[in-house]
Amino acid sequence: MVLTVTDLACARGPAQVLSGVSFSVSAGEALILRGPNGAGKTTLLRTLAGLTPPLAGTISHAEDAIAYAAHADGLKAQLTVAENLTFWATIFGTLDIAPAIAAFALAPLADRPAGELSAGQKRRLSLARLLVTGRPIWALDEPTVSLDTENTARFAAAVEAHLRAGGAAIIATHIDLGLPNARSLDITPFIAKGLPASDPFADDPFLGAAL
């Protein structure tokens, strides 16, 4: 297993959102998180990524194994597409941004400042950064927001390539990504007692993307 979660309890601020969450993910496997809006999918991903401490339970994985992509794109607007990828590649100790450029068809945009991109183009750049992290576990929160059908397919192809290389992915999404071997986990049974799934405080978007 590349990641094992045991009896995890998660909180957003002072409110407990989830309890008793247990699952594991193996190399080459994708896990799709399901549940209604506000159920705690974002909170769970933030906790897995180490951005929010768990209230209880354990998360077991190799050190520095997780790359987290949140709702917000978190790009450096003044840098070009290529410069954004180079910046992150340098941080993560990788050298070649060409595979990331190719995977998300960013070559025509390579010299354009990120601040001038459309919403869909920004999302493609944000997701392309996953390929320069070198990290085996991708934790992705609604990754296809702002993507059209063609680029959703590109994203799915990038995930499949990552899985074939021995990586893993945990994805919160409401759409079918076309990943035939992906497992699903409905987190609704893990919603903390007394907290309605519709509570907006339970699961608001993270605005400081880890990537």
From Swiss-Prot:
Keyword line: ATP-binding, Cell inner membrane, Cell membrane, Cytochrome c-type biogenesis, Membrane, Nucleotide-binding, Translocase, Transport
Cysteines engaged in disulfide bonds, as pairs: none
GO cellular component, one term: plasma membrane
Gene Ontology process terms (BP): cytochrome complex assembly
Record domain ABC transporter: where: 3-211
Subcellular location: Cell inner membrane
GO MF, any single term: ABC-type heme transporter activity
Membrane topology: Peripheral membrane protein
Subunit structure: The complex is composed of two ATP-binding proteins (CcmA) and two transmembrane proteins (CcmB).
Family of the protein in this entry: Belongs to the ABC transporter superfamily. CcmA exporter (TC 3.A.1.107) family.
Role description: Part of the ABC transporter complex CcmAB involved in the biogenesis of c-type cytochromes; once thought to export heme, this seems not to be the case, but its exact role is uncertain. Responsible for energy coupling to the transport system.
Name of the protein this chain belongs to: Cytochrome c biogenesis ATP-binding export protein CcmA
UniProt organism field: Jannaschia sp. (strain CCS1)
